[in-house]
């Protein structure tokens, strides 16, 4: 048996080799000694192949150390071959990956060294903000923004805030939120107010420009419309030539003038047509062809022979003028016929008009149901009530409680609170101030002694009552409230009376008496116009006495009488005797005589001969005819009443003129007296100011009563005298 020598395993690059079971080569070799094969010729064999060490030298093994059976050697040799194959694979991987791993290790070491150097010497950062607590959002470098989650970040690298570290970002976020929620200071508010005012001024200017443009457009439109209307009227006047006069008022000159005007208009038209070309004349004829058959015939002929267009136009104008003349003659004949109609026909037509209106009204009333009539009456009442309420004037503005000093340019600046007295009291030099030695003022209403303004109210200078400003204003307010309340009460009373009438009207409608009421109203004027022809004739329900309600009596105790209106017509009854007629005629004659006497005396005083003559004629007619003639002669009564009314109107006008003249004279005298008083007061004030330079309380009160214009004039006079 040959001896087997154990071969020690050499490390590869200092790393011991391991087999697949995780054991090193030495351990596997010690356990696999029994697996070695037989050694022939003094060499170790693995499956009959001699082995070498890692350096290529042959290995000699002492065969005396170990003797194994063939089965053990076979088993051990198989395991050893597997281990040897694994060793070869590892050796190959070590040869390929060894230099790369060493290079990677060297790079890692160099990177670590460079990182240490960079940490020791870091690159310079970007320029930071001078003050991190303030940001200018208007600057383009302000790149901080906040997202929906509230996180603040830098938008671009150009932002000055991009160099801020993460540790400083919390401070930046805090100041940014504080700046966003910060309230504006006074300067910012002032700037915003100025910007707002500038924007409002610009808006007003734009609105003013727009308004001016609208007005200009409207004026241009009106001018164009007016020019078009004037042009149309001028064309119409030229077309219809001169105005037509009826045959009754015409003479030879007017006829010749009309013919001359027609000739002139024809010449103008022909001159205008000469300026047009033949195609334009044909186009004009085509437009006129739809108006008359003659123009259509002329257009057809001109289309066949365009050279005769001007002559056809002249013929067409002549035919048109002849037609116009015929129409004027026909209208004049109709006017003359209507003017020559009898006045009786016109009077009958005028008399039929009220009857037709009454018939139409009755038909309308018959067509409506009672409910519709009541509804219409209520609507009319409501419309009338609304109209009355809208006519009520508004309440007068209440006087304001002034607790401040108004504008110095206002008229009530000095007279309101006595500002001049306050200034004199505050000044250091009190030489101009004169103390008031009299008793203190006291209000007659509230008995107060302290008021900033006093009011002296009275009809004359000797009858003046002193009141404070508060009492005067409260009295004015009470008066305004009382007047408004009285006005509303009167309106309410009117509406209440109308409501009562409406209720009565509705009651009549419900009872079916509306037709009778309407017939009574319609029969009232007809019965008033009936004239009795004899003493046995019926007496009208409404006599003629109301026609003379305004005739005054000599004693002045007469009152006008009014006709009594009833819902149903009162039928006249025949008289049993003429005593009542005689009494009525006597009373009527007495009243008329009294009125005539008064008017006659007035005419005598006024020296009006025409009025005297007319009244004498009417008086003689009345006295000569007697009572029966006065009752029968209604026309004379009517003339007499008209004459009396005219005389009364003349007397009233004369009295009004006299009263107006007296008022004007009194006003002139009062104005002259007021001017004299003001002149005297001004002279006294000037003397007081120029004498000692001191002003007493009365002078100050007079100065306060002056208007600003009077005060300015007084100051100018004082300045002029001081200069002299």
Curated annotation (Swiss-Prot):
Residues 186-216 form a coiled coil. InterPro entries: P66. Residues 1-23, 55-129, 328-361, 523-590 are annotated as: Disordered. Its main location: nucleus. Residues 332-358, 565-590 have a biased composition (Low complexity). Expressed at low levels in excretory cell, pharynx, vulva, and posterior neurons in adults. Strongly expressed in the excretory cell and more weakly in the pharynx in larva. Embryonic expression in the excretory cell. GO terms for molecular function: DNA binding; DNA-binding transcription factor activity, RNA polymerase II-specific. Residues 85-95 have a biased composition (Basic and acidic residues). It is found in: Nucleus. Residues 105-119 have a biased composition (Acidic residues). GO terms for cellular component: nucleus; NuRD complex. Residues 1-12, 56-70, 527-541, 551-564 have a biased composition (Polar residues). GO terms for biological process: chromatin organization; mitochondrial unfolded protein response; negative regulation of transcription by RNA polymerase II; positive regulation of transcription by RNA polymerase II. It comes from the Eukaryota. Keywords: Activator, Coiled coil, DNA-binding, Nucleus, Transcription, Transcription regulation. Transcription factor which binds to the 5'-CCATACATTA-3' motif found in the promoter region of pgp-12 and activates its expression in the excretory cell. This is Transcription factor dcp-66. It comes from Caenorhabditis elegans.
């Amino acid at each position: 048996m040959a001896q087997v020598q154990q071969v020690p395993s050499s490390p590869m690059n200092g790393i011991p080799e391991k087999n697949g079971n995780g054991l090193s080569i030495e351990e596997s070799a010690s356990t696999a000694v029994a697996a070695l094969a037989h050694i022939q010729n003094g060499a170790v064999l693995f499956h009959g192949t001699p082995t070498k060490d890692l350096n290529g030298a042959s290995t000699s093994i002492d065969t005396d150390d170990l003797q194994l059976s063939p089965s053990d050697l076979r088993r051990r040799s198989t395991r050893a071959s597997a281990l040897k194959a694994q060793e070869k694979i590892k050796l190959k991987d070590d040869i390929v990956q060894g230099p790369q791993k060493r290079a990677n290790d060297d790079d890692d070491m160099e990177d670590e060294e460079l990182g240490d150097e960079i940490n020791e010497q870091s690159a310079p950062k970007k320029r930071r903000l001078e003050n991190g607590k303030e940001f200018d959002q208007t600057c383009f470098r302000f790149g901080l923004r906040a997202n929906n989650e509230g996180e603040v970040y830098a938008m671009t690298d150009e932002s000055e805030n991009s160099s801020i570290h993460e540790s400083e970002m919390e401070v930046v976020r805090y100041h940014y939120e504080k700046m966003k929620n910060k309230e504006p200071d006074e300067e910012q508010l002032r700037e915003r107010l100025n910007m707002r005012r500038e924007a409002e001024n610009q808006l007003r200017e734009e609105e003013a420009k727009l308004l001016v443009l609208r007005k200009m457009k409207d004026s241009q439109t009106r001018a164009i419309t007016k020019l078009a209307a004037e042009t149309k009227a001028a064309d119409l006047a030229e077309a219809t030539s001169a105005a037509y006069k009826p045959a009754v008022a015409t003479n030879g000159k007017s006829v010749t003038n009309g013919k001359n005007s027609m000739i002139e208009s024809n010449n103008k038209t022909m001159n205008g047509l000469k300026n047009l070309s033949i195609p334009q004349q044909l186009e004009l004829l085509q437009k006129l062809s739809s108006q008359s058959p003659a123009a259509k015939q002329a257009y057809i002929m001109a289309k066949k022979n365009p050279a005769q267009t001007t002559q056809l136009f002249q013929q067409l104008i002549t035919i048109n003028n002849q037609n116009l003349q015929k129409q004027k003659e026909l209208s004049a004949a109709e006017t003359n016929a209507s003017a020559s109609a009898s006045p009786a026909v016109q009077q009958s037509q005028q008399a039929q008009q009220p009857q037709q209106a009454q018939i139409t009204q009755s038909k309308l009333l018959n067509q409506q149901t009672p409910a519709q009539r009541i509804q219409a009456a209520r609507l009319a009442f409501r419309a009338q009530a609304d109209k009355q309420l809208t006519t009520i004037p508004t309440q007068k503005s209440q006087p304001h409680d002034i607790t401040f000093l108004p504008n110095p340019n206002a008229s009530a600046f000095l007279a309101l609170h006595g500002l001049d007295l306050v200034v004199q009291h505050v000044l250091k030099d009190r030489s101009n101030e004169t103390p008031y030695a009299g008793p203190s003022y006291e209000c007659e209403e509230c008995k107060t002694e302290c008021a900033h303004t006093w009011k002296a109210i009275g009809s004359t200078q000797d009858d003046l009552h002193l009141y404070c400003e508060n009492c005067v204003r409260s009295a004015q307010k009470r008066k305004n409230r009382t007047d408004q309340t009285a006005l509303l009460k009167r309106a309410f009373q009117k509406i209440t009376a109308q409501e009562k009438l409406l209720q009565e009207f509705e009651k009549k409608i419900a009872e079916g008496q509306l037709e009778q009421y309407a017939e009574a109203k319609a029969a009232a004027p007809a019965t008033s116009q009936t004239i009795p022809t004899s003493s046995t004739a019926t007496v009208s329900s409404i006599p003629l006495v109301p026609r003379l309600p305004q005739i005054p009596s000599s004693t002045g105790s007469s009152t006008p009488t009014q006709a009594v209106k009833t819902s149903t017509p009162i039928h006249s009854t025949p008289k049993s005797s003429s005593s009542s007629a005689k009494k009525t005629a006597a009373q009527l004659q007495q009243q008329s005589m009294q009125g005539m006497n008064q008017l006659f005396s007035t005419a005598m005083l006024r020296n009006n001969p025409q009025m005297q003559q007319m009244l004498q004629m009417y008086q003689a007619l009345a006295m000569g005819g007697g009572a029966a003639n006065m009752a029968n002669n209604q026309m004379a009564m009517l003339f007499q009443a008209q004459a009396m009314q005219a005389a009364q109107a003349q007397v009233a006008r004369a009295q009004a003129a006299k009263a107006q003249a007296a008022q004007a004279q009194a006003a002139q005298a009062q104005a002259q007296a007021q001017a004299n008083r003001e002149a005297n007061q001004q002279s006294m004030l000037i003397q007081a100011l120029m004498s000692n330079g001191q002003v007493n309380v009365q002078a100050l009160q007079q100065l306060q009563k002056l208007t600003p214009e009077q005060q300015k004039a007084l100051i100018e006079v004082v300045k002029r005298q001081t200069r002299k």
